[in-house]
Amino acid sequence: TRFSTVTGVQTCALPISTKGLEFMFSPDFSVFKGSGWVGILATAGGQVFFSLSLGMAAMITYGSYLSKQESLVKNSIIVPICDTIVALMAGLAVMPAVFAMGMEPAGGPGLLFVTLQAVFNDMGTLGPVFGFLMYFLVFIAAITSSISLIEGVASAYIDSKVAKGQSYNRKAIVGIVSALLFIENLPTCLNALGMPGGHLANIGKFCWLDFYDLLAEGIMMPLGSLILAIIVGYKLKAEWVESEVSLEGNSFAGRSFWMFCFKVTAPIGMALVLAGQLDAFFALGLFN
């Protein structure tokens, strides 16, 4: 948090940095014209999936480790608020620098490894120090994110063994899952984002990173979330949800609101996100 604050102050002090602040906080409602709102919804949905680790079993897995005394309703409010605050701090550390350096406000590796590096270069003798700290923290973030992904798969397999009354070796399971994920992600390294010098060809019109992004953000996450919302809203129903949320005397505040979200808002929203993601990736023209 302190590092983001220092970086944010530095970037906001750059020339023309106010354009970055305008980009972040001045809404452009013209993007909602026609079918534009679908694209905005799809983009926001993709951000939510990755930022909050939704649709990938991470939240469910970590949630199952919570003490029964914890309020699920309270935690479901605190987590998104804290995530939004951190995202805003990260935006303040990056977006002013994007415009100050005359770059396009795009996302992805270029924003992280090109734009931010330009900021550190402008910081003089402290630049290399802050640059090292920044990319070290990015490395730590990647490792901790990988842990959450591995934990979801590993715990599901362990739970299946426990349900059958079989023994298991957690270290071996985690090692196997980690090795499989490492092998699965090798193509993204060998492909080099589809640029010259890569050792692996693109898959169709997509580089391997975009292809995995399509599978994860474009299909699996919204589809899985859609199915889960339907299961919770229509198969498990309100009584089961309330029995879980109300453990140890916790109150199910906003019960009607949450169930409306499960039954109506979430399924419709996830269906639109799924359609919007597929439309964006394949230029299907579904909403033209």
Regions of interest found by a model, annotated:
Residues 1-12:
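Single conserved hydrophobic/aromatic residue that forms the stacking wall/gate
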Residues 13-147, 161-173:
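Membrane-embedded translocation segments of transport machinery
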Residues 44-48, 80, 132-142, 178, ...:
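Hydrophobic alpha-helical transmembrane segments of multi-pass small-molecule transporters/permeases
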Residues 53-68, 139-155, 225-242, 281:
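Transmembrane alpha-helical segments in integral membrane proteins
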Residues 74, 105-114, 130-138, 156-172, ...:
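Transmembrane helix-loop boundary segments of multi-pass membrane transporters
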Residues 81-90, 180-187, 220-224:
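Membrane-embedded alpha-helical segments of transport systems
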Residues 154, 161-178, 211-270:
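C-terminal membrane-solvent junction of multi-pass transporters and transport-like membrane proteins
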Residues 184-192, 269-284:
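Alpha-helical transmembrane segments and their membrane-interface junctions
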